[in-house]
Amino acid sequence: MVSIRLSRGGSKKRPFYHLTVTDSRKSRDGRFIERVGFFNPVARGQEERLRVESERLNYWLSQGAQCSERVAKLIKDAAAAA
């Protein structure tokens, strides 16, 4: 099954996450199909906290991809803010 979930990057104590479309059997930070955005939980000032390529995200959702709980919440928050 294809899932849309967060993949961790960044350094120690400074997390940064990519929203990735991946096979659910792969590891968290392993091989992915496509990156569709990012989430920066420690963004300050003018830094961008969340970016989602909504066109690609909608494509994958139409193909049957399942979002993780956290990604679903981020998408909902992004839609409310826009």
Swiss-Prot record:
UniProt xrefs under SUPFAM superfamilies: Ribosomal protein S16
Keyword Ribosomal protein attributed: yes
Pfam families noted in UniProt: Ribosomal_S16
GO-annotated cellular components: cytoplasm; small ribosomal subunit
HAMAP family found in the cross-reference section: Ribosomal_bS16
Family (UniProt): Belongs to the bacterial ribosomal protein bS16 family.
Protein name: Small ribosomal subunit protein bS16
